[in-house]
Amino acid sequence: MFSKATYTARREELKKLVKDGIILLFGNNDSPFNGPHNGYAPFRQDSSFLYYFGQKRDGLVGVIDIDNNKETLIGDDIDIEDIVWFGSVHTVADMASEVGVAHSAPMKALRTIVADALRQHRRIHFLPPYRYDIKIQIMDLLGIHPNQQKEAASLDLIHAVVKMRSTKTQEEIEELERAAVIGYKMHTTAMAITRPGLTEKFVGGQIDGTANSYGATTSFATIYSQHGEIMHGNPSMAELQDGRLVLCDCGGETLEHYCSDNTRTFPINGKFTQRQLEIYSVVEKAHDYALELAKPGVKYMDVHFGVCKIIFDGMKELGLAKGDTEEAVRQGAHAMFLPHGLGHMMGMDVHDM
């Protein structure tokens, strides 16, 4: 968790950007793994809730009343039976105090807060929900059907959150650097142990274990597959074959939930064939070009299409494409070899903002 001052400053900036009304930031709830009585999936807090309220516990809602300059952390304290299973945890009031929030209230108070705001015809801001339990909660509070909630979400709040989360502070950059180190260790672990005869699943497990061993977790489900033509190929029980390439797409998430994401392709037996090396070298050239060009003030699309042209030129040299490169890229022919964007923003979500 960052300092109390960090979360306080973020909420103050958010209030200035949104200007008026009440902001509801829903934290996530525990999600059953495969049944209500059979364990729970590892809990991951909503990133925007984390950004402004910092707490990682389930079942919380942050309320920011801009007009009355009042902030409240909503949630129920655990009871004695919960303590038997989960141990003693901070009260909601304690958690509020940790992040500079002066008020706390049980979950039943949220209905009263929202009802009062609706009665006064005040603006109520929420972000587009992505979990169905939160969609039901919003429907229960605001009477908005889940199918209509994306359109009903506050554009002012969306723009403000995107603006703030898109620009990283120094402490966030340090977290991203930590995430990059974890990702590096995951990839080098994969490279070190990959060899013919192992299964994709085994190596994938070692990759995930590396992330966990550094006190973190994976930032998304690890992709490790000999079928690099399938962009999101999960590790299977297939044996690694001598002479083939394997694609590894993985990343780590720090304890503060900042993410890394890198993709590398390498030979299973440690040595490229001539053809593999030729194609790899085209990708490496494009990679180095992007690193050299990308800097503040340069448009992402200029870097993306510059890379597309390098790749198409390379494919022409290898006899895998033909035609005028400029026209081919304009018509989208490069998508035969690069069927996706060059990259994406990083932050608390692996595809940030």
Describe every region a protein language model picked out.
Residues M1-M353:
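Active-site neighborhoods and metal-handling regions in enzymes and metal-associated proteins
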